[in-house]
Amino acid sequence: MMHADEKIWIGFGDIHEDISRVNEIPELSDAEGVIISGDITNRGGIRKASQLLEVIYRLNPSIYAQIGNMDRAEITTYLDEKGWNIHATGKQLAEDIGIMGVGYSTPTPFRTPSEVPDSMLAQWLNKGYAQIKHLPKLILVAHDPPFGSKAADLPFGENVGNRSVLEFIQRIQPDICLTGHIHEAASEEFIGKTKVVNPGMLCMGGYVRIRLKDSKLDAKLMFI
């Protein structure tokens, strides 16, 4: 239930071509916008991504999205044309809130379509931040989770997080980091003052409720 004095955004990711549960998310249609952290498709291009995103658009036309490592790079062109892209880009989300994203991922054992060196992610993070650093509140959307975080824990103990994302969070301390990539690591925790939330795969029912109320920005891991 939303109140008149608050604003809500809904975040999720790792769609992997399964949006069967998206209309089960409470408040999705009434939210200020939808934030998508990456992996819209399974090695798909613009045609597949547009089919999926048009369904979400019909529920809520205010979309902020980026590709993950499982999406072909051409999808960024489509997102740019629609005005939805946040990868390597900073945008004003509300009066005093900036949002920025970094998609893709560092190399995986699976040779997925959109993998880059860690140094490239660092460049993209700096590029996006430069566009919105004047705003006092910040949401970082990072497909690759920060190194050492619960959001990057594999089931058997290995942590596969990203060092550039961690360094950026430690240095800038955004209010919220919406992340994904590691499906088994649905979690929420703080790194300094930054709330880091990985909702896992959308088809498993995880999403993030981001709320602005009384000038305070917070995020909560939710399940359908």
Question: What do the predicted segments below correspond to?
Answer:
Residues 1-58, 134:
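N-terminal active-site segment of His-dependent metallophosphoesterases
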Residues 2-10, 91-101, 133-138, 190-196, ...:
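Beta-strand-turn-beta hairpins that frame and shape the catalytic cleft
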Residues 10-13, 34-39, 63-69, 85-87, ...:
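Active-site neighborhood of phospho(di)ester-bond hydrolases with catalytic His/Asp-centered motifs
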Residues 17, 71-164, 223:
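Conserved catalytic scaffold of divalent metal-dependent phosphoesterases
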Residues 21-24, 40-57, 72-87, 111, ...:
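Metal-dependent catalytic neighborhoods of phosphoester/phosphodiester hydrolases
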Residues 25, 51-55, 124, 161-168, ...:
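A general structural detector for well-ordered alpha-helical segments in enzyme core domains, enriched
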Residues 28-29, 54-60, 94, 132-134, ...:
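Short, conserved loop/helix-junction motifs that constitute active-site signature segments
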Residues 153-214:
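Conserved beta-sheet core of the metallophosphoesterase superfamily
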